[in-house]
Swiss-Prot record:
Similarity remark: Belongs to the LDH/MDH superfamily. MDH type 2 family.
Binding locations of substrate: R92, R98, N131, R162
Stored InterPro entries: L-lactate/malate_DH, Lactate/malate_DH_C, Lactate/malate_DH_N, Lactate_DH/Glyco_Ohase_4_C, Malate_DH_type2, NAD(P)-bd_dom_sf
Annotated protein name in UniProt: Malate dehydrogenase
GO molecular function per UniProt: L-malate dehydrogenase (NAD+) activity
Name of the gene this protein is made from: mdh
Listed GO biological process terms: malate metabolic process; tricarboxylic acid cycle
Keyword Oxidoreductase (UniProt): yes
Keyword match Nucleotide-binding: no
Binding positions (NAD(+)): G11, A12, A13, G14, Q15, I16, A17, N105, Q112, V129, G130, N131
Keywords per UniProt: NAD, Oxidoreductase, Tricarboxylic acid cycle
EC number: 1.1.1.37
Native source organism of the sequence: Corynebacterium efficiens (strain DSM 44549 / YS-314 / AJ 12310 / JCM 11189 / NBRC 100395)
Active site: H187 (proton acceptor)
Length: 323
């Protein structure tokens, strides 16, 4: 049995965390040989809810769950953390401009980044789930200058999984059969779910689906799936977001040779400028994401990728005083 790992979850009394924490406690992030200790961070008014969640976690008697700590203090929450899921965020208010939403969330993620910088373990990995996730991750990263930038990710895995699900439904194939799907860009309506390189059972996906369906139905449906779920369910995606967060962190830590979509800091690959965090085609090796290199980019792809870059640069400009 390995030494325990400390995992911090923010917004611990919320709906996403309610699904996420059981998966973590069951050993699905670090594996069946690694115990976990949970730090649950909440705002003071929600500590009672977090306490109730902790009681239920204890009642589940997970063999790998060695400790639960509940706090509203940032420094305590991130002390010694090996992994952090930044789930808690301020939702968009009615009529609120996106710039105001970005600024209000920056006031949450900036201090969290500083606390991570000052108190987390050296091997800390941070996954931002709370939206607008890409720029929230940029803000947290910018406030943690002593932590390698590669340790800050935003979640595109939900979009990746949604894309595969739509393709499986369309083609009648199993989700597990699809490879080399990628979602480029921002976790927003501008995102670009890309099937250019995708295969299923050795066949090119682009040969199995109509191009008009791909452009006019598939891409917008994946991008707007969250809104579709809210309309049908009356609540935002929670269990699927939690499941995708586990997928991302597990693959980041344990590795994967198959492609995954991960929002990571740009290092200039595919002509994308540095200074933004965006979804890219990646594999995970030795605990680090590596961008899949050597892909040919056509004009259609370039236009979609560039639109995401422009959007993310605009978001960065809106929060430049927080970076």
């Amino acid at each position: 049995m390995n030494s325990p790992k400390k995992i911090t979850v923010t917004g611990a009394a919320g709906q996403i965390a309610y699904s996420l924490l059981w998966r973590i406690a069951n050993g699905e992030v670090y594996g069946a040989d690694t115990p976990v200790e949970l730090n649950l961070l909440e705002i003071p008014d929600a500590l009672g809810g977090a306490e109730g969640v902790a009681m239920e976690l204890s009642d589940s008697a997970f063999p790998l769950l060695h400790n639960i700590n509940i706090t509203a203090d940032l420094n305590e929450a991130f002390d010694g953390a090996n992994a952090a899921f930044l789930v808690g965020a301020k939702p968009r208010g009615k009529g609120e401009e996106r710039a105001a939403l970005l600024s209000n969330n920056g006031k949450i993620f900036g201090p969290q980044g500083k606390a991570i910088n000052d108190h987390a373990a050296q091997d800390i990995r941070v996954l931002v789930v709370g939206n607008p996730a890409n720029t929230n991750a940029l803000i947290a990263m910018s406030n943690a200058p002593d932590v390698p930038q590669s340790r800050f990710n935003a979640m595109m895995r939900l979009d990746h999984n949604r894309a595969i699900s739509q393709l499986a439904t369309k083609t009648g194939r199993l989700s597990s059969e699809f490879q080399d799907v990628v979602v480029w860009g921002n976790h927003s309506a501008a995102q670009f779910p890309d099937i250019t390189y995708a295969t299923v059972g050795g066949e090119k996906v682009s040969d199995l689906v109509d191009h008009d369906w791909y452009v006019n139905e598939f891409i917008p449906r994946v991008a707007k799936r969250g809104a579709e779920i809210i309309e049908v369910r009356g609540k935002s995606s929670a269990a699927s977001a939690a499941s995708s967060a586990v997928d991302h962190m597990r693959d980041w830590i344990q590795g994967t040779e198959t492609w995954a979509s991960a929002a990571i800091p740009s290092t200039g690959a595919y002509g994308i400028p540095e200074g933004i965090i965006l979804g890219l085609p990646t594999v995970s090796r030795n605990g680090e994401w590596e961008v899949v290199e050597g892909l040919e980019i056509n004009d259609f792809q370039r236009a979609r990728i560039d639109a995401n870059v422009e959007e993310l640069q605009g978001e960065r400009e809106a929060v430049k005083d927080l970076l």
